[in-house]
């Protein structure tokens, strides 16, 4: 867990009001821009991000054309943490699941991780991918997010859940 302002993890997570749950590094800054901006420099609202995959399948061209999967994971992790620093997030959590596991509806590890994050943060607003998204990894993240929310007691669920489009058209 990356905490841009250096607070303890429990304190950082307990102040979250807006939570973005995205499949890949850089998804959050497109799909949850509203929440990031709304919380930026606020004393009463805090954005936290969750990136579910490890970045191993990232595109490789130009300066990255010779990078291994491990090297790309480090590059993407550093990029996402820098975005959290710039956006002054309460926290940035990178779960490092392989994309294949996220797309596997029988694999409950992501859902369980998200359930724990939701319990610790208790956000009012959750941003995730659009359920009609064409990207299978995005749909896997959406399904796991909704399943995790539905496992929470009704009084612990977010007030608002927003499905956002970030990749091509619907």
Descriptions of predicted regions:
Residues 1-19, 100-170:
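Metal-dependent de-N-acetylase/amidase catalytic core
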Residues 14-15, 19-71:
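ATP-dependent adenylation/pyrophosphate-handling site
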Residues 21-23, 50-52, 95, 127-129, ...:
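Active-site neighborhood of phospho(di)ester-bond hydrolases with catalytic His/Asp-centered motifs
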Residues 44-45, 89, 156-160:
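A short helix->loop->beta-strand "cap" motif at the edges of active sites that frequently abuts
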Residues 50-53, 82-98:
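A conserved beta-strand->alpha-helix junction
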Residues 72-75, 86, 90, 107:
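His/Asp/Glu-rich metal-coordinating catalytic cores
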Residues 73-81, 142:
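Short, surface-exposed alpha-helical segments at coil->helix boundaries
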């Amino acid at each position: 867990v990356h905490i841009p302002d250096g607070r303890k993890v429990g304190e950082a997570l307990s102040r979250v009001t807006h939570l973005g749950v995205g499949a890949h590094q850089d998804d959050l800054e497109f799909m949850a821009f509203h929440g990031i901006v709304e919380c930026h420099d606020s004393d009463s609202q805090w954005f936290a991000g969750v990136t579910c995959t490890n970045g191993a399948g990232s595109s490789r061209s130009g300066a990255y054309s010779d990078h291994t999967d491990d090297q790309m994971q480090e590059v993407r992790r550093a990029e996402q943490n820098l975005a959290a620093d710039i956006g002054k997030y309460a926290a940035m959590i990178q779960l490092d699941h392989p994309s294949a596991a996220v797309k596997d509806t029988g694999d409950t590890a992501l859902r369980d991780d998200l359930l724990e994050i939701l319990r610790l943060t208790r956000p009012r607003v959750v941003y995730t991918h659009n359920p009609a998204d064409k990207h299978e990894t995005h749909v896997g993240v959406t399904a796991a997010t909704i399943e995790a929310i539905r496992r929470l007691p009704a009084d612990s669920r977010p007030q608002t859940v927003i499905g956002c489009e970030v990749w091509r058209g619907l």
